[in-house]
Amino acid sequence: MTVLHSIDFFSSSSAPVAIEARAPQSAFPEHHHDFYEIVIVEEGAGVHVFNGNPYTLSRGCVCFVRDHDRHLFESTDDLFLTNVLFRAPDAFRFLSGVGHFLPRECDGVYPSHWRVNGQVLQQIKCLIACLEHAPKSDQVEDIALHESVFMQLLVKLWQGCQTQAGDDQEGRLYQLLDWLQNNYSEAVEWPELADRFALPLRTLHRQLKNKTGMTPQRYLTRLRLLQARHQLCYSDNSVTDIAYLCGFGDSNHFSTLFKREFSQSPRDLRSQL
């Protein structure tokens, strides 16, 4: 597995933060690094496989990667990212309490993926632009200013995550996307789901396609296929059981869709493991 080292990304040993733009981000194999990373999705779509678990990416996704996590990007489609790198939450000279504004693992569950709305993405652009420039010098005042901008960015993201589920159409769409991520195996009737999240059905179709580049049904099918691939790799369940566990009513139809998506059958994938 590829290991990325801080010496290759930070401008100096004293630099607390580095910015790496990916415009666009192509598929990138599984890797980990000796620093922390905040991945901000500005445009496009793709799949982020984080510690073996697949997550679909779209505009407004924010992913928090620790120094012991492993991840990769695949199925990218005009995926524009800004990566904010920092050495560790406790590695700043003048900041304390950074961990308060980062995801915190609870009972073995790490909420690595957040969402923020378009307004927050616009608000943080100037902060990212400031962070792109290394501190003017190694003087303490320049390091302190640079770190303070990073804290502003972190607070903006944290506030944006807390408020993105607001009572407007964009917030309700984000709630729906999160619901699909966690309930992909359930039978979905789109008119009922639209009512549940107080979205007109046509608005749901239009906005979901704008966010993900896919129709709602295509998006759900892809979620299910990604989860099925994960189970094929990491569980002992049979192909038939996995098909039903991931929301497919027919294992033959599942195999057809799987081969179309990944260019190999479920059994062929299993045989390679």
From Swiss-Prot:
Localisation: Cytoplasm
Residue stretches spanning the membrane: none
GO biological process: positive regulation of DNA-templated transcription; rhamnose metabolic process
Classification via CDD domains: cupin_RhaR_RhaS-like_N (cd06977)
Gene Ontology CC entries for this record: cytoplasm
Residue ranges of DNA binding: 191-212, 239-262
UniProt-annotated site: Interaction with sigma-70, residues: D241, D250
Residue intervals of the HTH araC/xylS-type domain: 174-272
InterPro entries the UniProt entry points to: AraC-bd, AraC_XylS_family_regulators, Homeodomain-like_sf, HTH-like, HTH_AraC, HTH_AraC-typ_CS, RhaR_RhaS-like_N, RmlC-like_jellyroll
Record keyword Cytoplasm present: yes
Cysteine disulfide partners in this protein: none
Sorted UniProt keywords: Activator, Cytoplasm, DNA-binding, Repeat, Rhamnose metabolism, Transcription, Transcription regulation
A family per Pfam: AraC_binding
Molecular functions (GO terms): DNA-binding transcription factor activity; sequence-specific DNA binding
Function statement: Activates expression of the rhaBAD and rhaT operons.
Known partners and oligomeric status: Binds DNA as a dimer.
PANTHER family: HTH-TYPE TRANSCRIPTIONAL ACTIVATOR RHAS (PTHR46796:SF13), HTH-TYPE TRANSCRIPTIONAL ACTIVATOR RHAS-RELATED (PTHR46796)
Name by which UniProt lists this protein: HTH-type transcriptional activator RhaS
